[in-house]
C-alpha cells in the first residue's frame, strides 16, 4: 500500500524518540483542503483504529484510516533535508495534480 524510504523511516524513528506522548507509529490521513483539493495530515499515534491499514517497515508502523486508503495506495513516502527546510515528500500515483508546495494534491 505505502512504501517508506530509509530516510523516511529514520525521520519517523527520530520523531518517535523525541515525543513525550506514547506513540509507536505515524498516522497518515488525507483531508479535503489545500490548493489542489486534498492535503496530507501527519501525526504520531499509538494504536490502530477500526478499518485502519497498518504498514510496518524498518521497525516503524504507519496507520492509514479506511477513507484515506484509496488516496494513498501505491504512494512512496520520503524525507528530505535542504538548506531552507526539511520534510516528508509524497510520490503519489493517485494524484492527478500537485500543488507547488508538495503538501496537497488533486
From Swiss-Prot:
InterPro entries in the cross-refs: FeS_biogenesis, FeS_cluster_insertion, FeS_cluster_insertion_CS, HesB-like_dom_sf
Superkingdom, taxonomy of origin: Bacteria
Pfam families: Fe-S_biosyn
Membrane-crossing residue ranges in chain numbering: none
Keyword annotations of the record: Plasmid
A biological process from GO: iron-sulfur cluster assembly
Gene Ontology molecular function: 2 iron, 2 sulfur cluster binding; 4 iron, 4 sulfur cluster binding; iron ion binding
Family the UniProt entry places it in: Belongs to the HesB/IscA family.
Protein's recorded name: Uncharacterized protein y4vC
